[in-house]
Amino acid sequence: MNTTIIWHGHSNFQINANGISVLIDPFFTNNPRCTKNWNEIQKPDIVLITHDHSDHLGDAIAICKSTGALCGCIVGTADKLIQQGMPQHLIIGEIGFNIGGTIERKGVRITMTQSFHTSESGSPAGYIITMPNNFTLYHPGDTGIFQTMKTFGKLYNLHLSLLPIGGFFTMDSYQAAYAAKMLKCKMVIPMHWGTFPVLEQTPERFKNYLKAMAPECKYIAMEPNTSKEL
């Protein structure tokens, strides 16, 4: 069965496979690139948060409280969410999990990875996610490039990577293209661009760098509020 990727803009992705839906960095309210409210999307089974900046944490608490979706996040950020009203029983592990840890819920296998960024609570993180149909993808959250991406490329058969290219707060197009090379992913979708004026406004430079650095990696063109079947 195919995997459907929905991009709600910025770093907000929804991945659907075998009747299970995983939502990552659910930034809907005040997202200038998103045309839907959080209560208009398909009900997620799992919500993953990479870090607690408002453009990533987004509407996670409201979504989980309304839908009963499980929330995956790092220890520390879990405490912050609980203090802000997230029901503790919806937090995976009730206290969160941590970098290097792997959990499995609802047929989805999720490994938390490090990211190089900042967070007001806990540490910034990424996720390597294997859906129930064995489709494996990598969402690093906000990050700069780092050498361990090469290790991820050796350890995991990555069908897809979702890579930030905006620069300023994360790696830019040039670095992200080399990250795709290190990750050895079969496909890549650029993210974290065009949302705010300070970010890279189009993915064209990334597309060109990718062709030069990792020609074996397929570039998947997406615009916010669209979906792709892979």
Swiss-Prot record:
Keywords: Hydrolase. The keyword Transmembrane helix does not apply. GO terms for molecular function: hydrolase activity. The lineage of its organism: Bacteria, Pseudomonadati, Thermodesulfobacteriota, Desulfovibrionia, Desulfovibrionales. Gene3D superfamilies: Ribonuclease Z/Hydroxyacylglutathione hydrolase-like (3.60.15.10). Belongs to the UPF0173 family. HAMAP family: UPF0173. Pfam families: Lactamase_B_3 (PF13483). This is UPF0173 metal-dependent hydrolase LI0883. The keyword Ion transport does not apply. It comes from the Bacteria. InterPro entries: Metallo-B-lactamas, RibonucZ/Hydroxyglut_hydro, UPF0173, UPF0173_UPF0282_UlaG_hydrolase.
